[in-house]
Protein backbone atom coordinates (compact mmCIF):
# COMPACT_ATOMS: atom_id res chain seq x y z
CA UNK A 1 0.00 0.00 0.00
CA UNK A 2 1.31 3.46 -0.89
CA UNK A 3 2.73 5.20 2.19
CA UNK A 4 2.53 8.69 0.65
CA UNK A 5 -0.75 9.79 2.23
CA UNK A 6 -2.16 13.21 1.37
CA UNK A 7 -5.56 14.92 1.34
CA UNK A 8 -7.60 13.81 -1.67
CA UNK A 9 -10.44 16.01 -2.88
CA UNK A 10 -12.56 16.85 0.15
CA UNK A 11 -11.05 14.01 2.23
CA UNK A 12 -8.54 14.91 4.92
CA UNK A 13 -5.26 13.08 5.38
CA UNK A 14 -6.71 11.08 8.30
CA UNK A 15 -9.78 10.16 6.27
CA UNK A 16 -7.57 8.96 3.43
CA UNK A 17 -5.71 6.78 5.94
CA UNK A 18 -9.07 5.30 6.96
CA UNK A 19 -9.84 4.52 3.32
CA UNK A 20 -6.43 2.90 2.84
CA UNK A 21 -6.88 0.76 5.96
CA UNK A 22 -10.25 -0.45 4.69
CA UNK A 23 -8.73 -1.18 1.29
CA UNK A 24 -6.05 -3.34 2.95
CA UNK A 25 -8.76 -5.34 4.75
CA UNK A 26 -10.11 -6.80 1.47
CA UNK A 27 -9.61 -10.54 0.95
CA UNK A 28 -6.26 -11.24 -0.72
CA UNK A 29 -5.65 -13.57 -3.64
CA UNK A 30 -3.17 -16.41 -3.10
CA UNK A 31 -1.89 -14.74 0.08
CA UNK A 32 -1.08 -11.53 -1.80
CA UNK A 33 -2.68 -8.14 -2.16
CA UNK A 34 -2.23 -7.42 -5.87
CA UNK A 35 -3.19 -3.75 -5.67
CA UNK A 36 -1.82 -0.39 -4.58
CA UNK A 37 -3.92 2.62 -3.64
CA UNK A 38 -2.24 5.81 -4.86
CA UNK A 39 -3.13 9.35 -3.78
CA UNK A 40 -3.45 12.27 -6.18
CA UNK A 41 -4.82 15.72 -5.25
CA UNK A 42 -8.26 14.92 -6.70
CA UNK A 43 -8.59 11.13 -6.76
CA UNK A 44 -7.51 7.79 -5.39
CA UNK A 45 -6.08 5.44 -8.00
CA UNK A 46 -6.30 1.68 -7.60
CA UNK A 47 -3.33 0.21 -9.43
CA UNK A 48 -2.30 -3.36 -10.07
CA UNK A 49 1.03 -4.62 -8.77
CA UNK A 50 3.05 -7.68 -9.78
CA UNK A 51 2.19 -10.24 -10.97
CA UNK A 52 -1.05 -8.64 -12.14
CA UNK A 53 0.74 -5.72 -13.76
CA UNK A 54 2.64 -8.09 -16.04
CA UNK A 55 1.50 -8.74 -19.58
CA UNK A 56 -1.70 -10.77 -19.78
CA UNK A 57 0.11 -13.50 -21.70
CA UNK A 58 2.50 -13.97 -18.77
CA UNK A 59 -0.27 -14.58 -16.21
CA UNK A 60 -2.58 -17.61 -16.59
CA UNK A 61 -6.22 -16.59 -17.01
CA UNK A 62 -7.45 -18.29 -13.78
CA UNK A 63 -4.73 -16.53 -11.77
CA UNK A 64 -5.44 -13.18 -13.40
CA UNK A 65 -9.16 -13.59 -12.72
CA UNK A 66 -8.57 -14.34 -9.02
CA UNK A 67 -6.21 -11.38 -8.70
CA UNK A 68 -8.70 -9.00 -10.33
CA UNK A 69 -11.50 -10.31 -8.11
CA UNK A 70 -9.35 -9.38 -5.12
CA UNK A 71 -8.74 -5.92 -6.59
CA UNK A 72 -12.48 -5.49 -7.11
CA UNK A 73 -13.09 -6.39 -3.46
CA UNK A 74 -10.56 -3.74 -2.41
CA UNK A 75 -12.33 -1.21 -4.64
CA UNK A 76 -15.68 -1.97 -3.01
CA UNK A 77 -14.11 -1.35 0.41
CA UNK A 78 -12.78 1.99 -0.84
CA UNK A 79 -16.20 3.01 -2.16
CA UNK A 80 -18.03 1.93 1.00
CA UNK A 81 -15.63 3.79 3.28
CA UNK A 82 -15.69 7.01 1.26
CA UNK A 83 -19.49 7.01 1.54
CA UNK A 84 -19.50 6.88 5.35
CA UNK A 85 -16.97 9.71 5.35
CA UNK A 86 -19.61 11.93 3.71
CA UNK A 87 -18.46 11.85 0.09
CA UNK A 88 -19.73 10.23 -3.08
CA UNK A 89 -17.15 7.95 -4.78
CA UNK A 90 -17.29 8.68 -8.50
CA UNK A 91 -15.60 5.66 -10.11
CA UNK A 92 -14.09 5.05 -13.54
CA UNK A 93 -13.02 1.47 -14.20
CA UNK A 94 -9.95 0.79 -16.37
CA UNK A 95 -10.07 4.34 -17.74
CA UNK A 96 -6.83 4.36 -19.77
CA UNK A 97 -5.89 1.54 -22.13
CA UNK A 98 -2.35 2.93 -22.21
CA UNK A 99 -2.06 2.28 -18.47
CA UNK A 100 -3.15 -1.35 -18.03
CA UNK A 101 -2.12 -1.27 -14.37
CA UNK A 102 -4.62 1.54 -13.66
CA UNK A 103 -7.69 -0.42 -12.58
CA UNK A 104 -9.88 2.37 -11.22
CA UNK A 105 -9.94 6.08 -10.48
CA UNK A 106 -12.11 7.11 -7.52
CA UNK A 107 -12.95 10.79 -7.06
CA UNK A 108 -14.50 11.73 -3.69
CA UNK A 109 -17.28 14.27 -4.25
CA UNK A 110 -18.64 16.24 -1.30
CA UNK A 111 -22.24 16.39 -0.16
CA UNK A 112 -23.15 12.71 0.24
CA UNK A 113 -25.26 11.36 3.10
CA UNK A 114 -24.53 7.72 3.89
CA UNK A 115 -27.52 5.39 4.19
CA UNK A 116 -27.90 2.74 6.93
CA UNK A 117 -26.88 0.14 4.33
CA UNK A 118 -23.70 2.11 3.59
CA UNK A 119 -22.83 2.27 7.30
CA UNK A 120 -23.50 -1.45 7.79
CA UNK A 121 -21.24 -2.37 4.87
CA UNK A 122 -18.42 -0.11 6.11
CA UNK A 123 -18.60 -1.53 9.62
CA UNK A 124 -18.65 -5.09 8.26
CA UNK A 125 -15.26 -4.50 6.64
CA UNK A 126 -13.75 -4.81 10.13
CA UNK A 127 -15.94 -7.73 11.19
CA UNK A 128 -14.66 -10.63 9.13
CA UNK A 129 -16.01 -13.77 10.78
CA UNK A 130 -14.19 -17.08 10.75
CA UNK A 131 -15.44 -18.70 14.00
CA UNK A 132 -17.45 -21.94 13.70
CA UNK A 133 -21.10 -21.05 14.51
CA UNK A 134 -23.82 -23.31 15.93
CA UNK A 135 -26.37 -24.92 13.64
CA UNK A 136 -29.18 -22.86 12.16
CA UNK A 137 -30.44 -22.43 8.61
CA UNK A 138 -30.03 -19.33 6.43
CA UNK A 139 -33.56 -17.99 5.84
CA UNK A 140 -34.87 -17.26 2.36
CA UNK A 141 -35.19 -13.49 3.02
CA UNK A 142 -31.47 -13.41 3.82
CA UNK A 143 -30.65 -15.23 0.59
CA UNK A 144 -32.75 -12.67 -1.26
CA UNK A 145 -30.81 -9.83 0.40
CA UNK A 146 -27.56 -11.39 -0.76
CA UNK A 147 -28.90 -11.72 -4.29
CA UNK A 148 -29.90 -8.07 -4.26
CA UNK A 149 -26.42 -7.12 -3.02
CA UNK A 150 -24.91 -8.89 -6.03
CA UNK A 151 -27.33 -7.15 -8.41
CA UNK A 152 -26.34 -3.72 -7.09
CA UNK A 153 -22.86 -4.38 -8.52
CA UNK A 154 -24.23 -5.71 -11.84
CA UNK A 155 -23.46 -9.30 -10.92
CA UNK A 156 -25.59 -12.37 -10.23
CA UNK A 157 -25.79 -14.70 -7.23
CA UNK A 158 -26.80 -18.36 -7.63
CA UNK A 159 -27.07 -21.06 -4.97
CA UNK A 160 -25.67 -24.54 -5.56
CA UNK A 161 -27.86 -27.43 -4.40
CA UNK A 162 -26.12 -30.11 -2.28
CA UNK A 163 -26.12 -32.62 -5.15
CA UNK A 164 -24.63 -30.01 -7.50
CA UNK A 165 -21.93 -29.17 -4.96
CA UNK A 166 -21.09 -32.84 -4.55
CA UNK A 167 -20.79 -33.26 -8.32
CA UNK A 168 -18.42 -30.28 -8.59
CA UNK A 169 -16.26 -31.56 -5.72
CA UNK A 170 -15.93 -34.97 -7.33
CA UNK A 171 -14.58 -33.33 -10.49
CA UNK A 172 -12.31 -30.74 -8.87
CA UNK A 173 -8.62 -31.56 -9.55
CA UNK A 174 -6.72 -32.42 -6.36
CA UNK A 175 -4.11 -29.80 -7.13
CA UNK A 176 -6.74 -27.07 -7.07
CA UNK A 177 -8.14 -28.06 -3.68
CA UNK A 178 -5.53 -26.20 -1.67
CA UNK A 179 -6.28 -23.37 0.71
CA UNK A 180 -4.65 -19.97 0.87
CA UNK A 181 -5.55 -18.51 4.27
CA UNK A 182 -6.17 -14.81 4.87
CA UNK A 183 -9.07 -12.81 6.36
CA UNK A 184 -11.57 -14.46 4.00
CA UNK A 185 -9.71 -17.70 3.60
CA UNK A 186 -10.12 -20.35 0.96
CA UNK A 187 -11.22 -23.11 3.34
CA UNK A 188 -10.28 -25.79 0.81
CA UNK A 189 -11.88 -29.01 -0.32
CA UNK A 190 -12.40 -30.42 3.19
CA UNK A 191 -14.76 -27.66 4.28
CA UNK A 192 -16.39 -27.57 0.86
CA UNK A 193 -17.12 -31.28 1.18
CA UNK A 194 -18.48 -30.71 4.68
CA UNK A 195 -20.87 -28.10 3.25
CA UNK A 196 -22.75 -30.78 1.32
CA UNK A 197 -24.47 -32.23 4.38
CA UNK A 198 -24.82 -29.16 6.62
CA UNK A 199 -28.23 -27.50 6.61
CA UNK A 200 -26.81 -24.24 7.97
CA UNK A 201 -24.30 -23.86 5.11
CA UNK A 202 -25.00 -22.39 1.68
CA UNK A 203 -22.54 -22.40 -1.21
CA UNK A 204 -23.20 -19.49 -3.55
CA UNK A 205 -21.73 -18.48 -6.91
CA UNK A 206 -21.14 -14.87 -7.96
CA UNK A 207 -21.35 -14.61 -11.74
CA UNK A 208 -21.28 -12.06 -14.53
CA UNK A 209 -22.70 -11.92 -18.04
CA UNK A 210 -19.25 -11.36 -19.55
CA UNK A 211 -15.86 -12.98 -18.96
CA UNK A 212 -13.22 -10.29 -19.36
CA UNK A 213 -10.79 -8.40 -17.11
CA UNK A 214 -13.37 -5.64 -16.68
CA UNK A 215 -16.01 -8.22 -15.73
CA UNK A 216 -13.60 -9.80 -13.22
CA UNK A 217 -12.96 -6.42 -11.59
CA UNK A 218 -16.71 -5.76 -11.45
CA UNK A 219 -17.36 -9.24 -10.08
CA UNK A 220 -14.86 -8.64 -7.30
CA UNK A 221 -17.01 -5.71 -6.18
CA UNK A 222 -20.11 -7.89 -6.31
CA UNK A 223 -18.34 -10.63 -4.37
CA UNK A 224 -17.25 -8.21 -1.66
CA UNK A 225 -20.69 -6.59 -1.34
CA UNK A 226 -22.21 -10.04 -0.84
CA UNK A 227 -19.53 -10.94 1.73
CA UNK A 228 -20.01 -7.68 3.66
CA UNK A 229 -23.80 -7.99 3.54
CA UNK A 230 -23.51 -11.51 4.93
CA UNK A 231 -21.02 -10.41 7.59
CA UNK A 232 -23.30 -7.55 8.66
CA UNK A 233 -26.13 -10.08 9.12
CA UNK A 234 -23.98 -12.32 11.35
CA UNK A 235 -23.03 -15.01 8.84
CA UNK A 236 -19.62 -16.65 8.65
CA UNK A 237 -18.11 -16.24 5.18
CA UNK A 238 -15.19 -17.72 3.28
CA UNK A 239 -14.04 -18.20 -0.30
CA UNK A 240 -13.79 -21.42 -2.33
CA UNK A 241 -11.79 -20.36 -5.41
CA UNK A 242 -10.60 -23.90 -6.16
CA UNK A 243 -14.11 -24.79 -7.32
CA UNK A 244 -13.86 -22.58 -10.42
CA UNK A 245 -10.08 -22.54 -10.92
CA UNK A 246 -9.93 -25.38 -13.47
CA UNK A 247 -11.67 -24.84 -16.81
CA UNK A 248 -13.69 -28.12 -16.76
CA UNK A 249 -15.14 -27.57 -13.29
CA UNK A 250 -15.81 -23.91 -14.02
CA UNK A 251 -17.70 -24.98 -17.13
CA UNK A 252 -19.68 -27.47 -15.05
CA UNK A 253 -20.63 -24.79 -12.53
CA UNK A 254 -21.63 -22.48 -15.38
CA UNK A 255 -23.98 -25.14 -16.71
CA UNK A 256 -25.46 -25.68 -13.25
CA UNK A 257 -26.33 -22.00 -12.81
CA UNK A 258 -28.08 -21.77 -16.15
CA UNK A 259 -25.35 -21.41 -18.77
CA UNK A 260 -25.86 -17.69 -19.37
CA UNK A 261 -23.67 -16.44 -16.53
CA UNK A 262 -19.92 -16.90 -16.07
CA UNK A 263 -19.05 -18.12 -12.55
CA UNK A 264 -16.39 -15.84 -11.08
CA UNK A 265 -16.31 -16.57 -7.34
CA UNK A 266 -17.68 -19.26 -5.02
CA UNK A 267 -18.63 -18.32 -1.45
CA UNK A 268 -19.34 -20.45 1.60
CA UNK A 269 -21.94 -18.89 3.92
CA UNK A 270 -22.71 -20.27 7.37
CA UNK A 271 -25.30 -19.12 9.91
CA UNK A 272 -25.28 -17.77 12.57
CA UNK A 273 -21.89 -16.42 13.62
CA UNK A 274 -20.06 -14.67 16.42
CA UNK A 275 -17.10 -12.34 15.78
CA UNK A 276 -13.83 -14.24 15.96
CA UNK A 277 -11.55 -13.48 18.90
CA UNK A 278 -8.65 -12.42 16.67
CA UNK A 279 -9.00 -10.01 13.74
CA UNK A 280 -6.42 -8.65 11.34
CA UNK A 281 -4.79 -5.53 12.78
CA UNK A 282 -5.73 -3.47 9.73
CA UNK A 283 -9.39 -4.43 10.09
CA UNK A 284 -9.43 -3.54 13.78
CA UNK A 285 -7.97 -0.12 13.01
CA UNK A 286 -10.49 0.39 10.20
CA UNK A 287 -13.40 -0.36 12.51
CA UNK A 288 -12.20 2.12 15.15
CA UNK A 289 -11.60 4.86 12.61
CA UNK A 290 -14.91 4.27 10.83
CA UNK A 291 -16.86 4.51 14.11
CA UNK A 292 -15.24 7.88 14.76
CA UNK A 293 -16.07 9.03 11.23
CA UNK A 294 -19.80 8.20 11.37
CA UNK A 295 -20.50 9.67 14.83
Model-inferred region functions:
Residues 1-295:
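Acidic, surface-exposed loops and disordered segments
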Amino acid sequence: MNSDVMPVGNLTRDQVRTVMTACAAAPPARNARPWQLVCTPTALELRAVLPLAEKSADVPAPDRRELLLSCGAALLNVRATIKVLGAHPAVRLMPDENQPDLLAVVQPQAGFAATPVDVALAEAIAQRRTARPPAGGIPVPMINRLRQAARVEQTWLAILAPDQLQDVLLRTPDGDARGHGGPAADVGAANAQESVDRSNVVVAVVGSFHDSPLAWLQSGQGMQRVLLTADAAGLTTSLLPHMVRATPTRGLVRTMIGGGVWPQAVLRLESPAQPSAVRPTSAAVAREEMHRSVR
